[in-house]
């Protein structure tokens, strides 16, 4: 093959790659879910004394310092809070030992099992939500910055496919609402861009704190689609894709949502 032809093919490959990673919402138009709330709920989220999610953060801080498992270790035995400042903004990520994609909940449970010889915490349990909220609170204000390179690439692609896949009796995808219709009204609500940067979050409809996967399941229920069990690989892949499309938005945990 001539040099000019090879260069043309290479340029085309780069162009296709760039197009594949193109965001439906340009970075300068990214808006956190809090931007679609009324002034009262934005003020509630910003007030650390009134924000109901802070109750879970406070409980998580106690659990962080509390010994657990047969080794009698606490999370704080190994990790200093100052070193946790950036952690939540970088998850989901590939675990260097198992080479598996982990979200923050998985990371907590893996540390408990491998380092503390403690039982893993059940998904959506108050204990796991509290620890996750406490850790994510340390990253509040830090921009999301996940990696989709190397072994994370396949999970990113799977998450993107999942995001654009039509589902359920209503035959809708995540993109139909959160890419194409954001800012428009749906009954009494304004459709957000569907970013994960506030989770775990306190939702008024739940009257409690819930995880991002709980929110995903609620969306699936809303379009009458099958809900997978907590911790399913498809949810983890989708979490990575959602974090990538929210790159640059600051962590807001604990968020407040309707």
Q: Over which residues does each language-model region extend?
A:
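Post-cleavage N-terminal segment of exported redox proteins
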Residues: 2-5, 10-11, 16-57, 93-157, ...
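N-terminal, post-signal-peptide region of Sec/Tat-exported proteins
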Residues: 46-78
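The canonical Cys-X-X-Cys-His
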Residues: 71-82, 131, 159, 169-181, ...
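Short cysteine/histidine-rich zinc-coordinating motifs and their immediately flanking basic loops
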Residues: 85-93, 186-192
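Extended amphipathic alpha-helical interaction segments
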Residues: 137-144, 148-189
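Substrate-binding/catalytic groove segments of enzymes
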Residues: 170-171, 183-189, 222-229, 248-250
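An amphipathic alpha-helical core segment
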Residues: 175-205, 209
């Amino acid at each position: 093959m001539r040099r000019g032809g090879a260069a043309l093919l290479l340029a085309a490959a780069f162009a296709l790659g760039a197009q594949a990673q193109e965001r439906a919402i340009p970075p300068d138009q990214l808006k956190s879910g809090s931007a679609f709330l009324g002034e009262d709920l934005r003020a509630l989220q910003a007030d650390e004394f009134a924000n109901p999610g802070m109750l879970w953060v406070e409980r998580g801080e106690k659990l962080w310092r509390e010994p657990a498992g047969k080794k009698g270790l606490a999370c704080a035995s190994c990790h200093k809070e100052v070193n946790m400042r950036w952690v939540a903004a970088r998850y989901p990520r590939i675990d260097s030992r198992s080479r598996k994609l982990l979200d923050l909940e998985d990371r907590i449970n893996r540390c408990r099992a491998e380092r503390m010889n403690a039982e893993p915490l059940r998904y959506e349990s108050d204990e796991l939500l509290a620890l996750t909220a406490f850790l994510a609170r340390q990253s509040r204000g830090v921009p999301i910055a996940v990696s989709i390179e190397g072994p994370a690439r396949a999970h990113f692609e799977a998450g993107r496919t999942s995001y654009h896949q039509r589902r359920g009796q209503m035959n809708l995808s995540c993109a139909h609402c959160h890419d194409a219709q954001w800012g428009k009204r749906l009954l009494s609500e304004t459709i957000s861009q569907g970013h994960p940067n506030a989770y775990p979050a306190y939702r008024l409809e739940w009257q409690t704190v819930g995880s991002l996967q709980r929110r995903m399941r609620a969306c699936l229920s809303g379009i009458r689609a099958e809900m997978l069990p907590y911790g399913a690989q498809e949810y983890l892949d989708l979490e990575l894709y959602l974090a990538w499309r929210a790159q640059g938005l600051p962590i807001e945990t604990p968020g407040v949502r309707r």
